A protein has these predicted regions:
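Structural transition elements
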Residues: 182-224, 245-247
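Extracytoplasmic/peripheral linker and loop segments enriched in polar/acidic and small residues
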Residues: 1-2, 6-7, 172-173, 207-212, ...
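Ligand-binding "clamshell"
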Residues: 125-136, 284, 298-310
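Gly/Pro-rich hinge or "lid" segments in bacterial periplasmic/extracellular proteins
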Residues: 3, 18, 22-24, 29-89, ...
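Short helix-initiation/N-cap motifs at beta->coil->alpha
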Residues: 58, 95-107, 122, 244, ...
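Ligand/substrate-recognition segments at binding pockets and active sites
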Residues: 70-72, 215, 219, 223-294
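Ligand-site clamp/hinge motif
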Residues: 81-126
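Alpha-helical secondary-structure segments
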Residues: 11-17, 21, 61-62, 91-93, ...
Length: 310
């Protein structure tokens, strides 16, 4: 513990000594995505069931879970009276409904069963003039993960061909229509600024050439890759989640790839998110359509994913 530079000054005070400056340290300490204080006795008493139900889950924020089951389609939260700022919390609770069909979600919203829904595709056009409609960036990136242990995907030219042969602008404007923006990079605009007030994107540059949309260049890379592999065709399975938006993007990618890369066949595998994650973590997939969101306001929340062994 001494080597870690942490000290319990009293029952409610933690003192941390840093080896180097960290501008976002306070944020990290308060972010549930990074550090969570847990009662050791409680965690040990739950054994392997910790955090699998409302009774085996602790909370130190404004709300606590009152109803939750891993397979349930609803999660219910109630106000946490032990929260230090409980007097400032105006809601008695929050209820989350898991609805994969956006049309069903919109109908529930119109019926008064939901207060907030996320829209994509044609539903955006239906509601964009509605005063209740608003758009905001959440910093999430959708991206493709090729399994480089699979034959064909272990070839860099094949991977580059896949990356350059689909139109990101069309995905955002014709498929999603939800305010998403095309990116040829991974750290999004608006995440973090430096000491000069410059956005990270301004300071770091805007794109990686190997990701930019260029069908002719993609075809040349594809031809080169097939030659290196000694093949004239390849077949891959694209794995995606069972939400409307994920399936729509996957279908668009399937069409783009098959139209732009001669000899390529793409099959779609649609799974619930939990199953998709399990298969991808085990390496049982070809190409995965997945996403990542920032845990804190610093480029490293995105960049440290690409360090070997991370």
């Amino acid at each position: 513990v001494e080597e870690l530079g942490v000290e319990a000054a009293d029952d409610k005070t933690l003192v941390v000594t840093l080896s180097s400056p960290c501008a976002i340290f306070d944020y990290l300490m308060a972010s549930g995505a990074c550090f969570l204080p847990l009662n050791q006795k409680f965690v040990e008493s739950c054994g392997g069931n910790f955090a699998t139900s409302a009774d085996t889950l602790l909370a130190d924020g404004p709300f606590k879970v009152s109803s939750y089951e891993p397979s349930a389609m609803k999660v219910e939260l109630v106000k946490n009276d032990q929260f230090f700022g409980a007097s400032d919390v105006k809601l008695d609770g929050v209820e989350f409904s898991i609805i994969t069909d956006s049309q069903t979600a919109a109908l529930s919203f119109e019926n008064g069963d939901l207060d907030v829904v996320t829209l994509s595709g044609n539903l955006v056009e239906q509601y964009e003039d509605d005063p209740r409609f608003s758009t905001r960036s959440d910093g999430y990136n959708w991206y493709l993960t090729p399994n480089m242990k699979k034959e064909g995907l272990d070839n860099v030219n094949i991977r580059k061909a896949l990356a350059k042969s689909y139109d990101k602008e069309a995905i955002t404007t014709r498929v999603l229509k939800d305010g998403s923006t095309p990116m040829d990079y991974f750290v999004p605009q608006g995440l973090a600024t430096n000491e000069k007030g410059e956005d990270f994107r301004e300071a770091a540059g805007s794109a990686y050439d190997s990701w930019t949309y260029d069908v002719e260049a993609a075809k040349e890379l594809w031809k080169t890759g097939l030659g290196e592999l000694g093949k004239d065709s390849l077949s891959f399975t694209l794995m995606c989640e069972d939400t409307d938006s994920a399936q729509a993007v996957a279908q668009f990618l399937q069409s783009e790839w098959q139209n732009n890369l001669p000899g390529l066949t793409i099959e779609l595998q649609v799974l619930p998110k939990k199953a998709r994650l399990e298969y991808m973590q085990k390496g049982e997939y070809d190409i995965g359509l997945t996403r990542w969101g920032p845990d804190y306001a610093d480029p490293m929340t995105d960049l440290d994913m690409w360090i070997t062994g991370s």
